[in-house]
Amino acid sequence: VTSAGRGGNVLYLNDGHGVFHKATDALPTEGNSGSRVVAADMDGDGDLDLFVGSRSVPWKYGVDPVSMLLRNDGKGHFTDVTAQLAPELARVGMVTDAVWQDVDGDNRPDLVVVGEWMPITVFHNAGGARLTKMKTRGLEQSSGWWNRIIAGDFNGDGRIDFVVGNLGNEGSLTAVV
């Protein structure tokens, strides 16, 4: 998936021989251009669904754009299910990055979203039936100019950790190289 600017997003499919072709009817035509696209099987049906996060509305910087949750029908066609499954996600903020990761140990991918002038936001996945914004130990107060999030077991304790990049000195932790 790539951004087509004011024209929305475009999906390119591999033909199995290393050649990518534009899938003209795969994605919804409405919506802003995506700044970050992340895939996961959010509903447990065996195919990859998409979160398309948007950072800006053309010519209206600072206005929260529309981000989308797209369900894959298994044949490469995606339907916008944001209003039904995750209405709080539609205008979550100016998204710069996101990651699907099980944060609560239920073996379902939850969605963690970061962006400009917004808090780190976690959406709990209730088995693909609904994604709801979690109230999580002070993250509601984490507003910043977030630009990157990476998940991994960085300290070797067997649990997922997150490294989040922020421009500025608002945080309580500072990385020194």
Regions found by a protein language model. Give the residues of each.
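Hydrophobic beta-strand positions in blades of beta-propellers and related beta-sheet-rich domains
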Residues: 9-11, 50, 67-69, 120-122, ...
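Flexible loop residues that form catalytic
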Residues: 4-5, 42, 55-56, 103, ...
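Conserved, well-structured beta-alpha core segment at the onset of a catalytic domain
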Residues: 133-177
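Short, solvent-exposed loop/turn segments at conserved positions within beta-propeller repeat blades
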Residues: 4-7, 59-65, 115-118, 174-177
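Beta-propeller blade termini
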Residues: 13, 26, 33-44, 48, ...
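Hydrophobic beta-strand segments that make up the repeating blades of beta-propeller
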Residues: 1-4, 50-54, 111-115, 162-166
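Short coil/loop residues immediately preceding or within conserved phosphate-binding loops
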Residues: 6, 34, 64, 93-95, ...
